[in-house]
A protein has these predicted regions:
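Conserved RecA-like ASCE P-loop NTPase motor core of nucleic-acid helicases/translocases
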Residues: 133-140
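Conserved helix-turn-beta segment of the N-terminal RecA-like "Helicase ATP-binding" lobe
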Residues: 141-169
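Conserved pre-motif I regulatory segment
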Residues: 77-112
Length: 241
């Protein structure tokens, strides 16, 4: 897209986050439209302050306005937690290592691999790079326990490091595996599991079978733009269109 990169999001030591462009007229145009509601004060001809909490919404609105932003604001590391791959009798395959490196270089994205190609291993490798607390969102409890078993087999994590947040348990640990169903459950019109996203300073969020990601979960986590986020799937075709 020829307009991509003509507006950029950058971290700023004083303002937290800024939207910048080498073309002041673009910023003026955006300030007067719907995007303007998400913008702060004009710092100079080429720069507008932005509230960090609006990072996700602003990127969506810029895309709708025809000005897709290049996001150079980076990611926070989150709460540190040691983890390494335990390559005892096995090793990352070349394509798994390539997928992990490609994700890490961008900091956020989707890895598409066919069934049986080891998407969970790619997730574990990303966790080993992050060295931080990780929230893993899965389709159901069975998938969550498969993730737990695979992480215990493939990494240096212990059972005490991994928590299950499901209909049966509400454990929040350095590595927490939660089901989409429990995250989207409402009580008195409110998503009770919102506390899960704020319960720790997550450094990495992994979405298993991201093509099944419920819209409410997407909306909840779209505000977590400063966190590294990895989607894993065998297809990019969503079942709900």
């Amino acid at each position: 897209m020829s307009r991509y990169g003509r507006v950029r999001l950058q971290a700023h030591p004083a303002h937290g986050l800024i939207l910048e462009s080498e073309e002041p007229a673009i910023l003026t145009e955006l300030s007067r439209g719907k995007v303007g509601k998400l913008l702060g004060s004009r710092i100079d001809d080429n720069t507008i302050a932005v509230a960090p909490s609006e990072r996700g919404r602003l990127k969506q609105e810029l895309l709708k306005a025809g000005w897709p932003a290049e996001d150079l604001a980076g990611y926070i590391d989150g709460e540190s937690h040691p983890i390494a791959l335990n390559e005892d009798g096995w090793h990352l395959r070349d394509y798994q290592e390539y997928a992990t490196d490609a994700f890490w270089s961008g900091g956020s994205g989707v890895v598409v691999l066919p069934c049986g190609a080891g998407k969970t291993i790619v997730g574990a490798a990303a966790m080993a790079k992050a060295q931080s607390t990780t929230l893993i969102l899965v389709t159901n409890t069975v998938a969550g326990r498969q993730w737990r078993d695979e992480l215990l087999r493939r990494t240096t994590l212990s059972p005490n490091d991994i928590g299950e947040y499901s209909g049966e348990k509400k454990e929040i640990k350095p590595i927490t595996i939660a089901t989409y169903q429990v995250v989207t459950r409402k009580t008195k019109g409110e998503y009770r599991a919102l506390e899960l996203f704020d319960s720790r300073d997550w450094g990495l969020i992994i979405y298993d079978e991201v093509h099944l990601l419920p819209a409410p979960v997407f909306r909840m986590t779209s505000d977590l733009q400063s966190r590294r986020r990895l989607g894993l799937t065998a297809t990019l075709v969503r079942e709900d269109g």
